[in-house]
Amino acid sequence: MIASKKVRYPDLRKVEIYVLDDGDREEIALIAKELNVKYIRRDNNENAKAGNLNNALKETKGNLVVTLDADMVPRVDFLEKTVGYFEDSKMGFIQAPQTFFNNDPYQFNFFSEKNLNNDQDFFMRRIENQKDIYNSVMYIGSNAVFRRAALESIGGFSTGVITEDLATGMFIQAKGWKTRFVNKNLASGLAPENFSDLIKQRDRWSRGNIQVARKWLPLKIKGLNKVQKLLYMDGIHYWFSGIYKMIFMLAPLWFVLFGFYSLNARFSGILTFWLPSFIASQLAFNRVSQGTQSILLTNIYETVMAPFISYSVISDAVLKSKKGFTVTNKGYNTNKKYYNWRLSLPLLIILFFSIIALCKSIFVIFNILPFESGKDAIYINAFWLLYNVFILIFAVLVPFERPRFRKSERFLSSKEAQLLDKESHLIIDCKVMDWNELGAGITIECNNKIELKEEQKIILSVNGYELESVIRRIIPKKGGTNIGLIFTSLNYEQYAYLITQTYAVASSELPIREEKGNNIGKLLFDIFKGHFILKKK
């Protein structure tokens, strides 16, 4: 809420902020009142999020409507970077990518926070950008600005499915409105922080896409052109990839262990059809990803999710289950490490039998064991078994949950600051290394001994703001000292300043390169180093 109040706009009298609450939470109403933010309460949660948004449309009047999930924090330049597009009278909505402050389970549990992108970045920053060329940008539920007239032309946000966003954007485009994707980090939130919550989120997304296809098949939507229909069908079809991945993993097992054929063809015939397809898909993938994603890493992600997404898709597409909307838990922290055996069991079983099948293949190749179908049939299956085992080893490491100690994410900084005593007298100059609304890490470049001690009350002075703090940790280093601080008493202006310098900092002022080139070699090194260090500790 505070970040929304700090968003820049030429005439802030035209900006109204609303908190939409369909859970009747009195504490939320009190916070909204304290911050002078308008509060819209709904007595029920009919149609979940879409119903909540539609209810708010009836209570508001603005020509432009921004939708933000509760965990999404807009940057101060959000409106500056989006509203200008609506000078085009046919512009229906603007979509910015969802980005995240924290590390997802892949980044965190692989010990590869510095070398891996968030697994959603490929879609959010690359695929959406390509869809923009064909006016097929998908509305992703948050970080978007709508023209009210566009929403009214389709009767408001689509209801009756658990992913209202996909259908809403599709219908707006079908009405002839233009849409744009602004590929800038304009609002960030929290990604799922453990394997269980990640599965819940993807379960909801997959079921929602299937529900959209059952209720409003894109191929039959009047107003969409052929390319738009194809791209929407492709987005829905993606969720069936879990089934394909399961077949891909199980087919070599069926053949090597039980002699079941999934494909009866000569090796030369397979190469004739498969090799050109593989090369073409690899080139296309590299073109779209622009070095920020790899095929191997994508296969790891898809393998991890395959058993669960397959179940979700079959449940909704075939069995037509009635599972409703569920909210993904955010803000998870724990000081424990554990392995999620229950959720990893399907992957462990497939890995176990893949290793057995691979060993049998090797014995057949070296004439230790006979094989009715002959050795020629074994070679290609042995290759895919080896590949699957390699991928599955990575996959079964994802449910290994590391401790998450911090209650809030820290943000890098290089701001000059000063440490003051309780009477605001200067102790020494310092620099902020990282901080959030709860505390800060600072560094002092000084060879002389500093008379500071843990639990001492001091003041951190930054840009005119004097932040009352307590020293929690002092770590000597060569040529200076690193100090960990906890803020003890912040007024509104101080708290708002910290928010604008951390969560809501302008997109142009982000201190680090947002996208990294995913590298499987670095990932291997990170995993082995991380598990060795964690075990040692």
Region locations from a protein language model:
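Short, acidic, metal-binding catalytic loop of nucleotide-sugar glycosyltransferases
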Residues: 2-14
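Short beta-strand/loop segment that forms part of the nucleotide-sugar
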Residues: 13-23, 40
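A conserved acidic beta->alpha catalytic loop
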Residues: 20-28, 44-45
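Long helical/loop segments within the catalytic core of UDP-sugar-dependent glycosyltransferases
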Residues: 40-64, 76-162, 174, 195-236, ...
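The conserved acidic donor/metal-binding loop of glycosyltransferases
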Residues: 69-73
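Membrane-embedded multi-pass helical conduit in multi-pass membrane proteins
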Residues: 238-324, 339-402
